[in-house]
Regions:
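Catalytic pocket of metal/acid-base enzymes, prominently hydrolases
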Residues: 2-30, 44, 126-131, 135-148, ...
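Active-site core of metal-dependent hydrolases
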Residues: 10-124
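Active-site-proximal loop/turn and secondary-structure-junction residues that shape catalytic pockets
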Residues: 47-51, 71-73, 101-102, 153, ...
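Histidine-centered catalytic micro-motifs
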Residues: 69-72, 326-330
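Hydrophobic alpha-helix feature that most strongly marks membrane-spanning transmembrane helices
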Residues: 72, 90, 259, 305, ...
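Short linear, low-complexity motifs centered on an aromatic residue
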Residues: 76-91, 108-111, 214, 221-223, ...
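Glycine-rich, acidic/polar active-site loops that bind/position phosphate-bearing ligands
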Residues: 125-313, 322-325, 332-568
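C-terminal amphipathic alpha-helical interaction region
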Residues: 500-702
């Protein structure tokens, strides 16, 4: 039985949060730091030294010996280098020091991380810079206790080399433009608008011993071979089902660690596929939520090992059952407590809500390629549009009530509501909107769910920075256009009504409340002119589109050079991932599957000879051997094809884009063709002779 835990006592105990700062810092220093955080100003060196010393003392009291600048390079995972607090010994005695300079800035080898050409190998210098909007924290593990300082990562010449920098820039951009709208509606108390975010994290748990017997899982995170088990998810008995004790023990330890780190882990349950689960936190500031999601994924992978399990975060670890995604819930809130996507109780609030809603609708319609790119990676190519995840077509679900209101506005003004009630916006009447007046459409990639939007496309293994900074920047752009127009209006109420009406009429093609899985929607989306980008290689082009380059440059989120670098990194990552998968398939097929099948076929042949010698009928055995031999021959042929295509891909002297397309069109195709005979052979060969743990063992042996 797990030990009893008092969540209020342990929550945030390993975080140098506001309470700890107030306790450990002089009042004047604390107030100056708070002002710096709230206003986004620079921190002077004297104050930094005091903060660093207090942070060090707090960490050492908790047993820390080292600190690290924790950053998020373009690998999609986090990076860290640990330094001890030990200063040069004096008179043979150890001294523990930590200066403001060490807190604020660090140095790392930028050439060893993906840079897309921004850094050559001989241009190694890169810097980490303290992000004081995300609190430092302590991590306890086998190495002891370490102070983690969230940081941004940039090059010697100032280009962003990480996921955090554009996110922070985009949060400032959307706050700047949202405040203009808020001011127009009379709010004089708010100082900034923050992006609220919460990411629902899906994952698989499998037995660690079985995991270690699968090279594909070890090297690629997904199974490259595997026949369907007798039972999958068709009984619908795993979703929200009783949580197995072994998994529950893992979840308990995970929750305790996350709560100590200030991560507001809230919901846990079984997901649709066997061995699949989900953790969802309470929504919080977008920057913290992004850091916390990285902590969640890292903790899942590490803590699963404590229970002899392995956590799989890949988007599609098993064919034939649902893969994993990450639903990103997104909204905007003022610092005086107003959710700008919450339909209000007064005409004033409802008008403001509709303006923000229209900005999002317009932005999603004008920049669908960018949102699609933000959800693109090789693993997600297996999910999107496959009857288990949203389609690759970007559309918005609003629900019947909002749809009805917009339809009425289009034709002159809304005077009734599907839910009843009325409201006034100036001289125009609109019905009152009630929270949770929308149903849930699980097939929609971008759905309004009462007081937030739920972006359901992002990959389970990826950082949520990309979806967030893309959406933030898109909305900042549309809010800027709206503010420019409304600030010049002579009749504000009339201008708001016309803006809402015009925006809906011009962009309603992106709104779809039906079944996103249907073939009819694919045809309808084509008629509407909505892009259907089916794979991550095609999606990368969005980084280089003129309108996207202009968008990010205009709002100071990413420069054209930084965007070009990110495109190169995406192409290169795809190449490397598919190359690793192809080589793993070649290794497994030639060294494990083929030898096992040959050996088993020999045993069957010997059995046929022995049975014939005593006059027994061998029809069944001969048919079995014939099936095995035909599939073994096909396996051998497809193995050679994949080997040739992989060699051709590696020998290409073209740019990364051309090489990535070759891997997609030739290598990936050859991989699928090799898998087919291998999976058929699994069903023909004695299970004791098959060299790999089967899907049945992997999915149901927890």
């Amino acid at each position: 039985m797990s030990e009893k835990v008092s969540v209020p006592e342990i929550f945030g105990m390993n975080v140098f949060n506001d309470a700890m700062m107030r306790e450990h810092l002089p009042k004047k220093v604390y107030e100056e730091l708070k002002n710096t955080i709230e206003r986004g100003e620079m921190l002077n060196s004297e104050i930094a030294d005091i903060i660093a010393n207090a942070m060090k003392d707090w960490a050492i009291e908790r047993g820390a010996t080292h600190y690290t600048h924790w950053f998020q390079p373009m690998t999609g995972i986090t990076a860290e280098k640990h330094d001890s607090f030990l200063a040069p010994p004096s008179n043979g005695r150890a001294i523990m020091e930590f200066s403001g300079k060490e807190l604020i800035k660090g140095e790392s080898d930028a050439s060893s991380f993906p840079s897309g050409g921004l850094r050559a190998t001989f241009e190694a210098r890169g810097y980490t810079a303290w992000d004081w909007t995300s609190p430092a924290f302590l991590r306890e593990d086998a190495a002891g206790v370490t102070l983690y300082i969230p940081t941004a990562f940039y090059s010697y010449t100032g280009e962003a080399l990480d996921k955090k920098t554009p996110l922070l820039r985009s949060c400032e951009a959307v706050s700047r433009q949202a405040m203009r709208i808020v001011r127009l509606f009379g709010n004089q108390t708010a100082e900034k608008v923050t992006v609220s975010c919460g990411a629902e994290q899906e994952y698989f748990l499998i037995d660690k011993n079985l995991y270690q017997k699968r090279k594909d899982l070890i090297f690629t995170g997904r199974t490259l071979f595997g026949a369907a088990p007798p039972k999958g998810q068709e009984m619908d008995d795993h979703y929200f089902g009783s949580i197995k004790e072994r998994v529950a023990c893992f979840m308990h330890e995970l929750n305790v660690e996350l709560w100590k780190l200030g991560v507001p882990a809230k919901t846990q349950h079984n997901e649709v596929a066997p061995a699949q689960h989900e953790l969802a936190p309470i929504f919080e500031d977008c920057n913290k939520a992004t850091d916390h999601n990285q902590l969640i994924m890292e903790a899942m992978k590490r803590i699963s090992g404590h229970h002899d399990m392995t956590c799989l975060l890949h988007e599609k670890p098993f064919a034939g059952v649902n893969g994993s995604g990450k639903h990103v819930n997104w909204s905007l809130s003022t610092d005086d407590g107003q959710n700008l996507l919450d339909p209000g109780k007064t005409p004033h609030e409802n008008a403001q809500f509709l303006v923000f809603l229209c900005a999002i609708i317009k932005g999603v319609d004008e920049y669908p390629e960018l949102l699609r790119l933000s959800a693109a990676n090789p693993g997600n190519d297996h999910r999107l549009g496959s009857q288990e995840a949203p389609p690759a077509i970007i559309s918005i679900f609003l629900g019947d009530q909002l749809q009805d209101i917009f339809d009425q506005i289009e034709h002159g003004g809304a005077t009734s509501s599907l839910q009843g009630g009325r409201m006034r916006v100036g001289v125009n009447t609109l019905p009152a909107l009630k929270k949770d007046a929308t149903d849930r459409n699980r097939t929609s990639p971008f759905a309004f769910t009462g007081n937030k939007f739920e972006f359901r496309m992002p990959p389970s293994s990826a950082s949520i920075s990309g979806p967030n900074f893309s959406l933030n920047t898109i909305v900042a752009e549309e809010l800027q256009k709206f503010a420019d127009e409304l600030e010049q209006a002579e009749d504000f109420n009339a201008a708001v009504h016309e803006l809402v009406r015009r925006t809906y009429v011009e962009h309603k093609r992106v709104i779809f409340d039906g079944n996103g899985y249907s073939e009819e929607w694919l045809e309808e989306a084509t008629r509407r002119g909505l892009p259907n980008i089916t794979n991550s290689v095609d999606a990368v082009q969005a980084f280089l589109d003129d309108k996207v380059v202009e968008l990010f440059g205009k709002h100071g989120v990413l420069s054209s050079i930084e965007l070009q670098a990110r495109a190169e990194i995406r192409y290169e990552a795809y190449i490397k991932q598919i190359n690793i998968e192809a080589k793993t398939m070649l290794d497994m097929a030639s060294k494990q599957i083929r030898p096992a099948v040959v050996k088993y076929a020999g045993e069957v042949a010997q059995a046929i000879i022995a049975m014939k010698a005593v006059g027994m009928d061998t029809t069944a055995q001969e048919e079995l051997l014939q099936d095995i031999n035909e599939n073994l021959k096909l396996l051998h042929e497809k193995l050679k094809v994949l080997e040739e295509e992989t060699e051709r891909a590696g020998a290409l002297q073209e740019d990364n884009k051309t090489q990535a397309f070759f891997y997609r069109d030739h290598v990936f195709k050859a991989m699928k063709e090799l898998r087919e005979p291998a999976d058929r052979l699994e069903l023909l060969v004695d299970e004791n002779s098959w060299p790999l743990p089967t899907y049945g063992e992997l999915l149901f042996n927890i």
